[in-house]
């Protein structure tokens, strides 16, 4: 039986269409885009085409606004550090949400060590950023606002259009990390008011090893990698032509298939969430309910009384690939900073799992997941001292304190019923 892949926000398989597009650039059109001969010209033309395709996906004004990097992490580093270094004379203050991706938060920490300052705007219990809190954080030395389009853990869709208006009204560039949403949600950088926006094509059926950074022509950006004058002098180094061709092909595919992808994942997300909450008691959805404020590919869940890492490992043995936010480090459980930022209790954070859907998932696969996961949870709870204490009334549930003790289907106080 084919394994079920529910970890699409980590990476996606390369689509056959993308794979077909990139193959010639490994063995036939292998030239260096900077070379003057026909091999270089063919590679250079391929880069130009990929810029057009990526620009079309996000409705950029010009293909010249597209820069290629080695990945989403480098794109974020270039956006944050590049704007900061280019704006030193104007100011040194950066605003970020408290739950940005580490590529952004760690870049900001690096800059703080160099004398920049940062305001980390808190979020509500669903991970939503209040635009008024961002407005209130602006000072005369603010040079950059960083808020992601969709959070990488919670799946919450942030109010980017409102933030774009605030940034524009104050003459401050807005950097939007769209790695989580690119290829899955409509993106229009002009309507958003984004000065910079990053994508990672391997998240929407492209290749790993390439990133995209949109930069509005008026956004000042210093280079952070020095060498040649590739990418308009803003990103030195010979371009990864096959991966960039793949980025363009994946962008074109996403633009063409976006309505179908969105509709399908919305349907599967609802079916999956409805089935899991019906069959697994003491299960919490982190982030907004499925709907207009949540990306349809993501379900972030807390399974009470067990550890998410254990469930992820057991699911893998049973042919289901999913992610766990919490991980064991030595004898302690490391809680994801995002879950801490939304105020999730540690007892729930340690039971965190993330299921992320893709266009190749089927209703039959969802049915298998709904048949399998409740049994795995019952098995782990049968081995859990916390579940045993809860069943004996010694501790209470953090999810539903007033519900009283309750066994899941197939569970007893001592574990799963024998088959």
What are these regions (language model features)?
Residues 1-419:
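Pyridoxal 5′-phosphate
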């Amino acid at each position: 039986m084919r394994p079920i892949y529910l970890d699409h926000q980590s990476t996606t398989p390369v689509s056959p269409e993308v794979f077909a597009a990139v193959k010639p650039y490994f063995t036939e059109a292998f030239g260096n885009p900077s070379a003057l001969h026909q091999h270089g010209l063919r590679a250079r033309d391929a880069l130009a085409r990929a810029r057009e395709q990526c620009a079309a996906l996000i409705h950029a004004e010009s293909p010249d606004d597209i820069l290629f990097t080695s990945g989403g992490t480098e794109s974020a580093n270039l956006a944050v550090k590049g704007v900061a270094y280019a704006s030193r004379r104007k100011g040194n203050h950066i605003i970020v949400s408290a739950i940005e991706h580490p590529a952004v938060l760690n870049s900001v920490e690096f800059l703080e060590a160099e004398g920049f300052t940062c305001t980390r705007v808190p979020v509500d219990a669903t991970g939503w950023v209040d635009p008024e809190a961002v407005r209130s954080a602006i000072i005369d030395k603010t040079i950059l606002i960083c808020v992601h389009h969709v959070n990488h853990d919670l799946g919450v869709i942030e109010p980017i259009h409102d933030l774009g208006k605030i940034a524009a009204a104050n003459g401050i560039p807005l950097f939007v990390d769209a790695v989580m949403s690119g290829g899955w949600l409509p993106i229009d950088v002009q309507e958003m008011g984004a000065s910079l926006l990053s994508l990672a094509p391997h998240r929407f059926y492209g290749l790993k090893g390439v990133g995209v950074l949109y930069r509005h022509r008026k956004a000042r950006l210093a280079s952070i990698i020095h060498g040649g004058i590739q990418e308009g002098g803003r990103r030195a180094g010979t371009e990864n032509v096959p991966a960039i061709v793949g980025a363009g092909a994946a962008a074109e595919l996403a633009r063409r298939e976006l309505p179908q992808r969105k509709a399908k994942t919305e349907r599967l997300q609802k079916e999956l969430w409805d089935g899991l909450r019906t069959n697994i008691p003491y299960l919490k959805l982190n982030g907004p309910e499925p709907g207009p404020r949540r990306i349809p590919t993501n379900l972030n869940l807390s399974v009470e009384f067990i550890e998410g890492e254990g469930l992820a490992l057991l699911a893998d043995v049973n042919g289901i690939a999913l992610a766990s936010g919490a991980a064991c480090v030595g004898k302690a459980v490391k809680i994801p900073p995002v879950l801490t930022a939304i105020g999730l209790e540690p007892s729930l954070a340690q039971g965190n799992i993330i299921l992320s859907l893709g266009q190749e998932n089927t209703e039959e696969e969802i049915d298998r997941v709904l048949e399998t996961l409740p049994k795995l949870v019952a098995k782990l709870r049968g081995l859990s001292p916390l579940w045993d204490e809860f069943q004996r009334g010694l501790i209470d549930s953090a999810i539903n304190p007033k519900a009283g003790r309750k066994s899941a289907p197939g569970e007893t106080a001592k574990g799963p019923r024998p088959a």
